[in-house]
């Protein structure tokens, strides 16, 4: 049996670098870092326009069980999130926040994983196509919801902000897990 494998790939959390250690014919341990995926965009929530910056990533540590010592595997472990989503709004005209109208001010918000370290489950397949080389794919979930927070500059009542955040949190609570889809290439040595 060949030992360690190193791999590169892409996932819903960004570009991936992984290291795999096969413990036996049917069991292996896998660690990976995913990151580098970011985007900036605008979104409107209620009357408030936000500039949003999103950066995805984190570290995963998984135990793999290869079904019938085949390419199919079930994986379970943890994902430590390094994901950051920030939102900023600069109010320059009459804008309703909560129950009041504001004409000036700044709102800073963020969305993070509810769990910094969350359970992770996936099913995957490794296809060996040449001596030491394989292609793999995973489909799974990181079991963590998302939590929103916000603060405002002087003059914006936190009670009004809390009402806005409650609306955002209601939408986020509909997401009990973060989808995880990955594809990669490994080399065993």
Question: What is each PLM-predicted segment?
Answer:
Residues 2-4, 15, 25-27, 70-72, ...:
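Outer-envelope beta-barrel architecture signal
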Residues 5-21, 36, 175:
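Solvent-exposed loop/turn segments connecting transmembrane beta-strands
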Residues 1-3, 22, 29, 36-37, ...:
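A membrane-pore/channel beta-structure motif
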Residues 33-60, 82-118, 144-180:
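Extracellular/periplasm-exposed beta-strand and loop segments of Gram-negative cell-envelope proteins
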Residues 8, 17-21, 61-65, 76-78, ...:
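Residues on the lipid-exposed face of transmembrane beta-strands in outer-membrane beta-barrel proteins
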Residues 1, 173-174, 189:
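Cleavable N-terminal export/targeting peptides
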Residues 10-14, 33-39, 67, 78-84, ...:
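Transmembrane beta-strands of outer-membrane beta-barrel pores
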Residues 121, 130-131, 135-137, 148-150:
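A C-terminal functional module that forms or caps the active site or interfaces directly
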């Amino acid at each position: 049996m060949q030992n360690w494998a190193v791999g590169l790939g892409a996932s819903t959390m960004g570009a991936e670098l992984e290291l795999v250690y096969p413990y036996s014919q049917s069991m292996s341990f896998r660690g990976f870092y995913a990151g580098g995926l970011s985007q900036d965009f605008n979104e409107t929530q209620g009357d408030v326009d936000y500039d949003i910056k999103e950066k995805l990533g984190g570290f995963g540590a998984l135990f793999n069980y290869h079904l019938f010592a085949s390419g199919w595997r079930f994986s379970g472990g943890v994902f430590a999130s390094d994901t950051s989503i920030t939102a900023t709004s600069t109010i320059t005209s009459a804008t309703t926040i909560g129950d009041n109208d504001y004409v000036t001010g700044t709102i800073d918000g963020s969305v993070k994983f509810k769990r910094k370290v969350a359970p992770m489950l996936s099913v995957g397949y490794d296809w060996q196509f040449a001596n030491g080389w394989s292609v793999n794919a995973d489909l799974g979930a990181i079991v963590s919801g998302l939590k929103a927070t916000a603060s405002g500059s002087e003059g914006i009542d936190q009670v009004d902000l809390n009402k806005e955040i409650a609306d955002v949190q209601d939408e986020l609570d509909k997401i009990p897990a973060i989808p995880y889809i990955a594809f990669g290439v490994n080399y065993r040595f």
